Amino acid sequence: MLLSGCIGGSSPHVFNGEEPNIGGDAYRFTLIDQDNESWSLSDAEGKVVVLTFIFTRCPDVCLAVTASMLWVQNNLDEQDLDQVQFVSVTVDPWTDTFEVLREYSTSRGAEWPHLTVADAGAGGDSQQNYAALESIWGKFDVGMEMYGVENDTDYLIEHSLPTYILDRTLEKRVVWLGSEWNPELFKQDVEYLIQE
């Protein structure tokens, strides 16, 4: 007797978070960190990567995600912590210079890489830098909109807030959306990928 149907197929989603809309290998990008040093996602290969998108002037949700990531970092076993790389990428490169990101990360005890571009202002290289960052946002399904622009410092940003967990090969395996996620369940997803 022959049965029709599928045997095997993709494995079930075993995570507390969601399956990414844009899955597969993560886009390998290079930006500058809060120490004005080049930082490449490729350098994190071999570790589980927690990757989010924030901005320092954000009054609420970005602070909540940073605090949750810090909780996860502080509550991982020491041997597990060595196998995880936390990373934050700005959605406000006009304000979030490396100096601003340094102050933000230091004041919150969030010493992982906080990334931006060298210059996102008007003109030559700065437009290319902004375009590169915009491409990164697109590859990670980050929507961003500026409004209320009165001058260079008086504007608001609204953005989606995905936090990805990438496996050791830098494949996007799980995403947590928004800021109201449970850090304990998030930590379980990180630990699952550490043990995988």
Name what the model sees in each region.
Residues 26-27, 48-49, 160-162:
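Short loop/turn microsegments at loop-to-beta-strand junctions
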Residues 48, 55, 73-80, 108, ...:
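Sec/Tat-exported extracytoplasmic proteins
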Residues 39-69:
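Short active-site neighborhood of thiol/selenol oxidoreductases, capturing the structured segment around
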Residues 1-12:
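Secretory targeting signatures
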Residues 66-134:
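Structural microenvironment flanking redox-active thiols in thiol-disulfide oxidoreductases
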Residues 11-42:
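N-terminal "domain-start" segment that seeds a small globular fold
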